[in-house]
Structure formats: C-alpha cells, structure tokens
A protein has these predicted regions:
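Non-catalytic DNA-recognition/assembly elements of restriction-modification systems
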Residues: 184-224
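Polybasic, glycine- and aromatic-enriched phosphate-binding surface used to engage nucleic acids
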Residues: 1-192
Length: 224
C-alpha cells in the first residue's frame, strides 16, 4: 500500500466541501485495514489526495494551500524530502498507480480470519493493506469471484493458519510471501463455487447499498 508520511495532509473526508473546488484527477478512493471485509470492501468516508500528479504547485494553488500547506513543515522533514528524493508536497511512497487502478483482490496485512475482497473501484490502500491481480495468462482459467470464494472459505482459513504466522491473540499476519504459497485448485465444482461466490458478492453489495440508503433517510430526519 501507500505510505503518505502524513495522513492528516493527504487523507480527507469525502464530504469536505473544499474537494469540489479541486480537480478530481487528484482524488482517489482510500481505505485502511478495517475497511476490508470478506468478499467486498466496506464503504470508506476517506479520499486520498494523490499529489504526485501535481506538475506545478502554483497551478494547483487551492489544493496546495488548503490541504497541504498547513503541514508543510512536517512534510519537509520527511526523510525522502530532506534527501531531495521527493518534493515537499508529494506522497512519501506513492507507488505506481497501475497497481491500484485495476480490478484486484485486496486483503488486510493482519487479521483473525481470511478477509479477501474484490475491488472494482480503483481503490487505493494504506500500508496495512496488500493486493494482487490475476495475470493475463490465467484470466480465462480463474475468475476473481472464484478466488475470493476459495480464499474466504473455512477450508482455506484453516489452510492458511497452518502455514501462516500467528502474531499473538489469534491474529495472523498475511504477508504476500505466505499468500503466494497457497495452492489454488480447480475441479468439476468450479462453476458452482464461482456462481455461489458471485451471489455472495452481489448480496453483500446490496446490503451496503440498502444500509447507505437507510442512513441517508435517518440523517435527513435528524436534520429537520
């Protein structure tokens, strides 16, 4: 995931009215470890300012002055800025955008159980999140829905805990080197597993949509 070096500067509430005044190309969906559930990513109220795309800070004066300038001293004191590897307004480690701007599976770096979620919204994540995508040569062999169906199953939860490392209090670390050791099987039940997993994903997304609608009505009632 991304290391900002100062979340207060780069991570903002998506309801902040000032966001309407800046170019949308600098705003990315942003989640942390806690936002990942089984199968889907829960709604996050945060956006990331991807300031590495700023070519000239003077041209983006409102963005810089409003969100970044208040933390300039702290941003300048980051190691990479002191060594002139980064401009003061850039993310500490912004990573390559293509890693985030594609369909992928995201998962937390530590958890008590397997939590693998499909992302279709080009979501960016913090350093406590890992992700992977299906290589082109395997896209006709496996679907994302099939994979999360396997990985979130009780069988694969037990499987991972055999090879994974417990950090304490039944919390396991999910470092990529361990995840990549998991064997993925495919047999005559593939279509059924995929179909059931697609159903779970669909129902989970519907649940979030209904929950959001409910909260909207309640907020409107409280505002009267």
């Amino acid at each position: 995931g991304i290391i900002t070096g100062c979340d207060k500067a780069f991570v903002v509430d998506k309801n902040d009215k000032n966001l309407q005044k800046i170019n949308g190309k600098f705003l990315k969906n942003w989640i942390k470890n806690k936002d990942i559930g089984k199968y889907i990513i829960n709604n996050s109220q945060s956006m990331l300012i991807y300031s590495n795309d700023i070519k000239n800070e003077e041209e983006e004066e409102f963005l810089v002055e409003t969100f970044l300038k208040p933390y300039k001293q702290k941003l300048q004191n980051r190691r990479e800025c002191r060594r002139n590897y980064r401009k003061w307004y850039e993310l500490q480690w912004g990573r390559e955008k293509y890693l985030f701007e594609q369909k992928k599976i995201m998962y937390p770096y530590k958890s008590r159980s397997n939590k693998f979620a499909i992302d279709i919204d080009n979501t960016y994540g913090s350093a406590d999140i890992y992700s992977f995508y299906i290589k082109d040569e395997y896209k006709n062999e496996f679907s994302y829905e099939y994979l999360v169906g396997l990985l979130n199953s009780k069988t694969y939860d037990k499987y991972f805990k055999i090879i994974g490392k417990e950090m304490g209090k039944k919390v396991f670390d999910y470092y990529p080197n361990k995840i990549m050791k998991l064997k993925i099987f495919k047999d005559e039940n593939y279509d059924e597993i995929e179909a059931l997993s697609k159903e779970v994903v669909s129902l989970s997304r519907q649940k979030i949509m209904v929950s959001n609608e409910l909260n909207t009505y309640i907020n409107e009632c409280n505002g009267k």
